[in-house]
């Protein structure tokens, strides 16, 4: 999956079938496409809406795009994955599940900059 992280970056993780082969990360679209060069890849996520033409241009016949109804995450998909894990005896403690933030939001970055300036004055 790829999510538009703005400024030419995408949030993503790479999977082969259901095995995760990279951690969640924020990388430039160019870096991601160079990593995938010559590998058949299915693209999902809102990053596809923003970068489909660039992906197709760079990847050519190696790029496949999920149909629109499967492009974005749905709660039912998360429930399905949880069910599959449970069938394999894997359970997550819902009290410990947290979102993954790969970089600070713009408001937080600006606040930190102001605080840094304030401390130096």
List the predicted regions and their residue ranges.
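Surface "functional belts" at beta-alpha junctions
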Residues: 1-72
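Acyltransferase
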Residues: 66-121
């Amino acid at each position: 999956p790829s999510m538009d992280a703005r400024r030419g970056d995408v949030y993503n993780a790479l999977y082969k079938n259901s095995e995760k082969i990279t951690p969640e990360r924020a990388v430039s679209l160019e870096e991601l496409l160079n990593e995938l060069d010559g590998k058949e890849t299915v693209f999902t996520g809102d990053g596809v809406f923003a970068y489909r033409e660039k992906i197709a241009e760079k990847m050519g016949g190696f790029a496949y795009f999920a149909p629109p109804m499967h492009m974005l995450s749905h709660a039912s998909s998360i429930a399905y994955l949880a069910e599959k894990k449970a069938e394999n005896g894997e359970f997550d403690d819902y009290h410990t599940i947290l979102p993954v933030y790969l970089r600070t939001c713009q408001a937080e970055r600006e606040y930190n900059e102001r605080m840094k300036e304030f401390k130096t004055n």
